[in-house]
A protein has these predicted regions:
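Short glycine-aspartate micro-motif
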Residues: 5-9, 60-62, 135-139, 209
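N-terminal phosphate-binding loop and adjacent alpha-helix
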Residues: 25-57, 86-99, 174-191
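Glycine-rich phosphate-binding loop and adjoining helix at the ATP-binding site
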Residues: 36, 41-49, 60, 69-127
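Glycine-rich phosphate-binding loop plus the immediately following alpha-helix
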Residues: 97-121, 154-194
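Active-site glycine-centered loops adjacent to acidic/histidine catalytic or metal-binding residues
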Residues: 120, 141, 210
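Short glycine-rich, Thr/Ser-proximal phosphate-binding strand/loop in the N-terminal lobe
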Residues: 2-46, 150-181
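Phosphate/pyrophosphate-binding loops at sites that engage ATP/ADP/AMP, CoA/4′-phosphopantetheine
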Residues: 46-62, 71, 111-115, 185, ...
Length: 210
């Protein structure tokens, strides 16, 4: 039986999905979907169900979510608890719905397919690491994503992006997409370089992927 995987990247501004074969070859890219707000867990599950219904070849599902995801369960999640998305007001009801939500178990039950839910940066990282030494992956988008692997084994997730770096700002705010657009690529790239220099003494990676 062919192993065909639906991969879903759930971001703060957009949701991207692809179907991959066993070797990681892309069989189909679904059209980019702007993240709809407000976004409840049930609404996101409905979106993923629609992807599965659109391609009968899908045999398993991998979902990447922003924030702290532990054993498939949401510990902390940004963006989706906000009424209108990133940096808008927090909706207490959305926060209550998302925090502690067992996305992996519930999604697997709904889809009736093997399902894995991880932090989005960890999913990206799994596609690029070599599995040797201490490897760190940093992703830049709405905010900063990160993943650390030791000899191919995923380390417990750290929300590095929540740390304060300059002027009382979190790394997310200091280095995110909004800052890049405001500053321009050249100045923003200097910030990225500065951030990497500050992170290295804390992690001391053998290889860094950006």
């Amino acid at each position: 039986m062919k192993v065909t995987t639906l991969t879903v990247d759930c971001g703060g501004t957009g949701i991207k999905a692809s179907v991959l074969d066993k070797g990681g070859k892309v069989l189909i890219d679904f059209p980019y979907l702007k993240t709809p707000y407000p976004l409840s867990p049930s609404k996101l599950i409905g979106i993923i169900q629609d992807f599965v219904k659109a391609d009968l070849r899908i045999k398993r599902v991998t979902v990447g979510l922003p924030g702290m995801i532990r054993n498939g369960k949401v510990v902390v999640i940004p963006h989706y608890i906000n009424i209108n998305g990133p940096r808008s007001a927090v909706d207490p009801n959305l926060k209550k719905a998302w925090y502690g939500f067992d996305m992996q178990s519930i999604l697997q039950k709904r889809l009736k397919l093997p399902t894995l839910v991880l932090n989005d940066a960890e999913v990206h990282a799994a596609a690029v690491i070599e599995g040797r030494g201490l490897e760190t992956v940093l992703t830049f988008g709405t905010g900063l994503g990160s993943a650390i692997f030791s000899d191919g084994n995923l380390a417990p997730h750290l929300e590095i992006s929540h740390a304060t770096i300059r002027y009382g700002k979190s790394i997310d705010t200091w280095i995110g997409e909004q800052a890049r657009r405001r500053m321009g690529n050249q100045l923003w790239s200097r910030r990225v370089k500065s951030l990497i220099q500050e992170l290295y003494p804390m992690i001391i990676w053998d290889k860094l992927y950006i």
